[in-house]
């Protein structure tokens, strides 16, 4: 019997809604695989499940960190795997769009437990991406072959791990896939439709109070909080600073979300184990339900 059902895909494809309905049918629970929903108080801009939704179906790995704490992929993997091993429910639903979180579970990634060194990161970032990638090619050519030259996040992390440990990150990584059955379900739709979904969701976030949420978080934690420089928050922060209009902020959120969604689609499409379903299918719930019953 399948122990874990993964529901993944780009942002705004309806993963959470599908998961909620499936969990209620299965009498199951949801494990979030979203790198921002782990943080408390970051609610509207992360499309975090509402309190009513969390009451209807138990959700885990949501609101487990303060905004000033750091949740690494290794931290997430450890906590998620502990829940998978201990929760007396089967199948569990692992739901989200953070590819590394999902990959850490379904492929059993071996991840170096190296805490972020922010002073070192600041020094490395000041070198610029081109120079930093050149350093990576020198100290860890194996990792450089797997990391795109224009991927600053993974480039920085790989160089950071080398400088902290003296060992290339590629030599510290590997995979130990779990021995339990996993069904991976991906949701996707035409890019034009996805753009419409993103626009609609952005408008809903504004209506739900995103501006007030960002204003509150800036006052409580300071506008330089790293999380406030992420998608949906950085644009509203610009609006609150008087740099752009609210309409311009919304347009930027839509643009940046579309760009993010394209990267997510590329990431997930690289994994042949994922079975894809049309997010716009009127009978999506029943179609996926039939697949689960097979």
UniProtKB/Swiss-Prot annotation:
Question: Is Ribosomal protein among the key words of this record?
Answer: no
Which superkingdom? Bacteria
InterPro entries noted in UniProt = Dimethylallyltransferase, IPT, P-loop_NTPase
Q: Where is this site: Interaction with substrate tRNA?
A: 98
Question: Which EC main class describes this enzyme?
Answer: transferase
Annotated region (Interaction with substrate tRNA), positions in chain:
34-37
What are the protein's UniProt keywords?
Answer: ATP-binding, Magnesium, Nucleotide-binding, Transferase, tRNA processing
Reported function: Catalyzes the transfer of a dimethylallyl group onto the adenine at position 37 in tRNAs that read codons beginning with uridine, leading to the formation of N6-(dimethylallyl)adenosine (i(6)A).
**Name the UniProt record assigns to this protein:** tRNA dimethylallyltransferase
Origin species: Trichormus variabilis (strain ATCC 29413 / PCC 7937) (Anabaena variabilis)
